[in-house]
């Protein structure tokens, strides 16, 4: 893995999460939509680290694949909807991180900005030896953490931030994500921003509200959400 440990340039941002299904894809789409709206003279790369089962890559292709000066890439795909090392084992395949690394390098060389969606949580296995946190740290990817607005979210977030610090992930901030209409009215109860900032010493960059399916596929609506984030705290915007 030593060949992968060079510094990655700061135009690349990794979107990680506290768990599977917490809103990483919606958050990534909203950030990408903001770039689409505000960076007309720039080129963009959107990458899913790897995919198991169906889902994110197809949505990204639908939303962004047709845009000029955009590339949407998922370098490794497995049909089995399990953690990547287990999916690869079941399919008789191996996980070649060299392919993922080279894809990232190519995206960085060809685009002004690169946005990468992780899988699962920071503790999720990517190979039999490495987790998402290990990859983020090894590749020096500046990272934001998506926190679900639900009971137990603060404990999840604090534990994930502790893991990030242990593995030396360059964590830049938190994004709160509402997966249900009820969650929007429970932010202060379930994922109190002031308490999260106090315990993690990281800024809460913004809140992704509950979105209907049609809203999740509307670039203008997605861009509106991200425009309210504290993106001045990130170097990419």
Curated annotation (Swiss-Prot):
GO cellular component: cytosol
Signal peptide: none
Gene Ontology biological-process entries: biotin biosynthetic process
Coiled coil: none
InterPro entries to which the protein is assigned, alphabetical: DTB_synth_BioD, P-loop_NTPase
Reaction(s) catalysed (UniProt annotation): (7R,8S)-7,8-diammoniononanoate + CO2 + ATP = (4R,5S)-dethiobiotin + ADP + phosphate + 3 H(+); (7R,8S)-8-amino-7-(carboxyamino)nonanoate + ATP = (4R,5S)-dethiobiotin + ADP + phosphate + H(+)
SUPFAM superfamilies, per the entry: P-loop containing nucleoside triphosphate hydrolases
Positions with a binding annotation for ATP: 21-26, 56, 117-120, 177-178, 209-211
Pfam families listed in its UniProt record: AAA_26 (PF13500)
Location (main, coarse): cytoplasm
Metal-binding is among the record's keywords: yes
GO molecular function, a single term: magnesium ion binding
Active site: 48
CDD domains attached to this UniProt entry: DTBS
Entry EC no(s): 6.3.3.3
Protein keywords: ATP-binding, Biotin biosynthesis, Cytoplasm, Ligase, Magnesium, Metal-binding, Nucleotide-binding
Presence of the UniProt keyword ATP-binding in the record: yes
Pathway participation: Cofactor biosynthesis; biotin biosynthesis; biotin from 7,8-diaminononanoate: step 1/2
Cofactor: Mg(2+)
Quaternary assembly: Homodimer.
Entry similarity comment: Belongs to the dethiobiotin synthetase family.
Function: Catalyzes a mechanistically unusual reaction, the ATP-dependent insertion of CO2 between the N7 and N8 nitrogen atoms of 7,8-diaminopelargonic acid (DAPA, also called 7,8-diammoniononanoate) to form a ureido ring. This cyanobacterium does not encode bioA (which catalyzes the formation of the precursor for this reaction in the cannonical pathway), instead it encodes bioU, which replaces bioA and also performs the first half of the cannonical BioD reaction. Thus in this bacteria BioD has a different substrate.
HAMAP family: BioD
Record-given protein name: ATP-dependent dethiobiotin synthetase BioD
Organism of this sequence: Synechocystis sp. (strain ATCC 27184 / PCC 6803 / Kazusa)
